[in-house]
């Protein structure tokens, strides 16, 4: 077949849908997306190709390409016959990478926003097209590394082992857990005692409501709260802040909703969103992995799990539905699955070094899985340790940086009981409890601990049932005080040796130097917010015993 190599210097040439396989880039792609016939043909491929899913739809590609026009350069390799689209491979590359970088990565459309990537082709062209497309791409951009993850089940991959391709490809299998709503055993899952116990516990806490959100205004109104929950957990676990770092993700989520590509459900307690799943959907499949959140403040009641089961129960009303729990090796997904299939990760490159590295990674991941360890978790743990040590090395010569929290000895001589008084001075700031937006304003710069460590500590504290009171100013977190009570004390081996379940213990403190003069007022304001029932006590290290001199509410514990 005839091949047309697109010039990097002339990306704006008139688009020509020639016979055979052609590569289109940048403005050429946007011209294709404005052609109704091209979109109709793409849509036809989307519905007819047996491995296709919502991430392969023209609607998804248009949303991503148009929202991230400045960040990513679109590439489409397409095959035409008699003016009709027969196959295509939608891709993207970081903006300007082609012109500015010696080597660069080309990824499937959607980058890390897409759970699945790959190509579409009419029957009989599934293998011949992808080999032509990749050969054309590597000829046009010889130093490119092509990354496709995950390739869906049923997509042909046997060609990778052919002599012409085996030295240029690194292929990795990933199991994919599924919940098929047609499975006759599925109803038993909704009756499990562990689920019913968690559900009833939440119901006793207040008015619990599970609902699907289909109204655009309601979806737009709730999206900021979900973005906060998502960024908070992603920041604590992976040091990622998707919405905070790139507000365009909000634009993408709105565009996908408008395109009918999202299935949105929330779980609320007394009107507050405590869990959500915003999943990409299409062709009777729902793909977990868009936005999956829960409130850390209510984590002790497992709202995320309860929401997941309620969603599965709702989907089970249509036996044609499949709930894709997505690849990745998560243990909890494997426990919930009723079926499994295989997806793939694929790297293609002219570089022997890149392929050897890719194959070594495959062997490492397989070794981790055999040992019962999740590869991405192992990699993340190493990355976190390196991140922390790099930060500490940077701060070796710096003095006076505030600690994330003090660590006083849990001894009676460090315990002070607090007399709660009604007189509370007017403060120039507002004290908030478990306020994710303020906690996300902790920055590594100017602190002993990294932001990653801080968010992890905040999250785990709330998941234990503790409260984190905080105050921010000028887009920076100024101070925090941790308060433990009830079961949070009982579950703590250290605190339970000195304190009882009825106590409210203020026991960890964080303060920026510029806020120290106001910290006493912050402390007193928190005391005023606490319930009268029970005893309020403070566990003070030497760094914070200045509070005793500044306030008259203390007495020996």
Regions found by a protein language model. Give the residues of each.
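Active-site/acyl-donor-binding loops of N-acyltransferases
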Residues: 2-24, 93, 153-187, 318-385, ...
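Aromatic (often tryptophan-rich) hydrophobic motifs at membrane interfaces
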Residues: 80, 85, 97, 109, ...
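Non-catalytic substrate-recognition and accessory regions of acyl/acetyltransferase enzymes
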Residues: 385-494
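A conserved beta-strand-loop-helix scaffold within acyl/acetyltransferase catalytic domains
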Residues: 22-106, 149-299, 447-509
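A generic secondary-structure signal for well-formed alpha-helical elements
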Residues: 46-53, 141, 230-238, 315, ...
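Acyl-group handling in specialized metabolite and lipid biosynthesis
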Residues: 120-123, 184
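Short secondary-structure capping/junction motifs at helix and strand boundaries
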Residues: 142-148
């Amino acid at each position: 077949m005839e091949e047309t190599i697109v010039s990097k210097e002339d990306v704006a040439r008139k688009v020509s849908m020639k016979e055979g396989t052609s590569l289109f880039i940048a403005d050429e792609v946007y011209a294709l997306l404005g052609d109704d016939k091209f979109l109709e043909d793409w849509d036809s491929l989307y519905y007819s190709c047996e491995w296709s899913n919502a991430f392969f739809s023209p609607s998804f590609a248009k949303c991503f390409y148009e929202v991230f026009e400045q960040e990513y350069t679109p590439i489409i390799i397409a095959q035409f016959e008699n003016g009709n689209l027969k196959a295509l491979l939608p891709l993207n590359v970081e903006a300007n990478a082609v012109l500015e970088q010696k080597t660069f990565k080309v990824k499937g459309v959607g980058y890390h926003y897409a759970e699945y990537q790959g190509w579409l082709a009419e029957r009989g062209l599934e293998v011949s097209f992808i080999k032509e497309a990749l050969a054309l791409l590597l000829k046009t951009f010889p130093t490119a590394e092509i990354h496709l993850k995950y390739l869906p089940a049923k997509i042909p991959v046997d060609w990778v082992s052919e002599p012409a391709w085996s030295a240029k490809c690194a292929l990795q299998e990933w199991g994919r857990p599924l919940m098929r709503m047609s499975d006759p055993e599925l109803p038993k899952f909704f009756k499990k005692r562990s689920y019913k116990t968690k559900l009833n516990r939440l119901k006793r806490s207040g008015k619990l409501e599970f609902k699907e959100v289909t109204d655009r205004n309601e979806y737009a109104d709730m999206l900021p709260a979900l973005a906060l929950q998502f960024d908070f957990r992603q920041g604590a676990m992976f040091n990622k802040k998707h919405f905070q770092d790139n507000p365009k993700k909000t634009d993408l989520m709105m565009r996908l909703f408008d395109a009918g590509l999202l299935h949105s459900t929330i779980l609320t307690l007394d009107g507050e969103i405590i869990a959500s799943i915003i999943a990409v959907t299409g062709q009777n499949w729902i793909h977990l992995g868009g936005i999956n959140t829960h409130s850390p403040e209510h984590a002790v009641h497992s709202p995320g799990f309860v929401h997941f089961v309620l969603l599965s129960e709702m989907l089970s009303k249509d036996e044609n539905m499949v709930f894709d729990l997505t690849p990745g090796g998560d243990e909890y997904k494997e426990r919930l699955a009723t079926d499994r299939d295989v997806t793939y990760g694929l790297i293609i490159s002219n570089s022997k070094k890149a392929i050897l590295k890719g194959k070594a990674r495959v062997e490492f991941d397989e070794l981790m899985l055999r040992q019962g360890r999740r590869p991405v978790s192992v990699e993340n743990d190493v990355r976190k340790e390196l991140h922390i040590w790099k930060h500490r090395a940077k701060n070796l010569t710096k003095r006076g940086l505030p600690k994330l929290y003090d660590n006083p000895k849990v001894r009676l001589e460090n315990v002070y009981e607090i007399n709660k008084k009604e007189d509370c001075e007017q403060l120039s700031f507002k004290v908030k409890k478990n306020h994710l937006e303020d906690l996300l304003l902790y920055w590594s710069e100017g602190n002993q601990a990294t932001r990653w460590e801080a968010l992890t500590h905040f999250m785990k504290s709330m998941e234990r049932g503790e409260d984190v009171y905080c105050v921010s100013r000028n887009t920076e977190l100024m101070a925090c005080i941790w308060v433990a009570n009830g079961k949070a004390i009982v579950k703590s081996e250290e605190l339970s040796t000195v304190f009882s379940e009825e106590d409210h213990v203020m026991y960890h403190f964080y303060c920026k130097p510029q806020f120290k003069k106001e910290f006493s007022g912050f402390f007193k304001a928190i005391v005023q917010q606490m319930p009268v029932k029970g005893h309020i006590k403070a566990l003070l290290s030497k760094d914070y015993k200045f509070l005793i001199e500044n306030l008259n509410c203390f007495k020996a514990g």
